[in-house]
Amino acid sequence: MKQDIIDRLTRYVTIDTQSNPESTTTPSTEKQWDLLNLLNDELTDLGLETDIDEQGYLFATLDSNVDIDLPTVGFLAHIDTSPDFNASHVNPQIIDNYDGTPIQLGKTNRTLSQDVFPAMKNVEGHTLMITDGTSLLGADDKAGVVEIMEALKYLTSHPEIKHGKIRVAFTPDEEIGRGPHEFDVERFNADFAYTMDGSEYGELQYESFNAAEAIVTCHGVNVHPGSAKDAMINAVLLGQQFNALLPQNEVPERTEGYEGFYHLMKINGDVEKTTLQYIIRDHDRNEFELRKKRLVEIKNDINSHFEDEPIEVEINDQYYNMGEKIEPNPHVIDIPKRVFEKLGIPANTAPIRGGTDGSQLSYMGLPTPNIFTGCDNFHGPFEYASIDVMEKAVQVVVGIAEEVVNTYDK
């Protein structure tokens, strides 16, 4: 199976599927269709019934091979790659039996090293797929796509493995936060599902951040600096003042675990007008609401010193902690936990310091935890995939299909 995984992952990552946050279409880039169409053909070749809509949501069905009434389980992965780094001309490299020493990435000056990425100690002895240093790898989330496809291939070639109805979805635009926006939960018609979009071995994640975006707009008054006294209002300095009033330790680089943060993503402007773009994250819903409230309070405090209120704040929620929807459905976690135990995989249920498509899908009525893929260092040239861990992830998908039968055939 290992060589099959390498071949399939190579085939997928060399197709450029980078999404574009500036686009208003779905998918956001035409090139995402290249992989979607390939997957549609490959699913059909496996004997699955497929359904792809005009917005790039590819669904497929593996019919049940048992005569009992079972819930339908779904597996999902996104096909787009991050816009944060070059995603074209991906040239994957294979490292057999990784020995823990630094790896030079192609002909670049970039080095993949445990000194910088200590999690790589966990994949010593594994076969790795890495980049040549000029692009991201795209294992986020093409590794998840591979794992689902390899599991389907295994199930279709081993009819002795009993399973209920399985639904599969490959989706666009997750990397720009739009993955589930046009996802038709009713058409997908699963009772619960799993995103194959995690990272390190053993991850089984059912808690995510609550997430919002905030746009702070500072309006200034531009006057010639030679006659600016008591007349100029510098929008750049207003933005600086606004950010200084936020808790300086509650930022991504100083938080971990369940700790939330404010993240200043971008500043753009001049004396006349300056905008600050933030993301707000917290696992606790009450703390999340307080964080948003704090931005408004800072705005009001600064504005109170001016006749014309110069600062505006616009806040938009993006997704919520999926744990609120998954915890009332404990079987959705218990099933993969039993599979992990049978396979000897230690389950790591630490919260996601981020979100997945499952964060939004869970609030759309489809409880969807997240499972490891065996990849790390996403969105850049240091991304890598452990083929050994990917092989385990394939076994998890197959195991969940089996465990649904074991759970409900009583």
Curated annotation (Swiss-Prot):
Cofactor: Zn(2+)
Annotated active site: D80, E174
GO molecular function, one term: metallopeptidase activity
InterPro entries: ArgE/DapE_CS, Bact_exopeptidase_dim_dom, Peptidase_M20, Peptidase_M20_dimer, Peptidase_M20B
Reaction catalysis annotation: Release of the N-terminal residue from a tripeptide
Enzyme Commission code: 3.4.11.4
Amino-acid biosynthesis found in the keyword field: no
Comment on bound cofactor: Binds 2 Zn(2+) ions per subunit.
HAMAP family named among the record's database cross-references: Aminopeptidase_M20
Its job: Cleaves the N-terminal amino acid of tripeptides.
Recorded family membership: Belongs to the peptidase M20B family.
Name under which the protein is recorded: Peptidase T
Organism of origin: Staphylococcus saprophyticus subsp. saprophyticus (strain ATCC 15305 / DSM 20229 / NCIMB 8711 / NCTC 7292 / S-41)
Lineage of source species: Bacteria, Bacillati, Bacillota, Bacilli, Bacillales
